[in-house]
From Swiss-Prot:
UniProtKB keywords: Cell membrane, Membrane, Transmembrane, Transmembrane helix
Record-annotated membrane-spanning stretches: 4-21, 28-50, 54-73
The organism of origin for this protein: Archaeoglobus fulgidus (strain ATCC 49558 / DSM 4304 / JCM 9628 / NBRC 100126 / VC-16)
Gene Ontology CC: one annotated term: plasma membrane
Compartments, as annotated in UniProt: Cell membrane
Protein name: Uncharacterized protein AF_1578
Membrane topology: Multi-pass membrane protein
Amino acid sequence: MIFLIISVPFGIYSLVIYNLTRRAPGKMRYLIPPLLTATLPALYLPLTGFKVSYDLLPVVGYLTYSQFLLLLLQLQR
């Protein structure tokens, strides 16, 4: 279960990064720090204690997803 929570977002992010590097290689430098800030909280919660963080997981998932959408919107401009 923990493996799924960690691996699924990374799979999605790696696909998006791959697509963005093909389209706009110059923007990759600006992309990596926001991606890290979006993924680290989602990875930190399951590692701290899964039973405690299970209630918080949807909240953190939503926050990271919204950060990720904002990042994509910034790239479109």
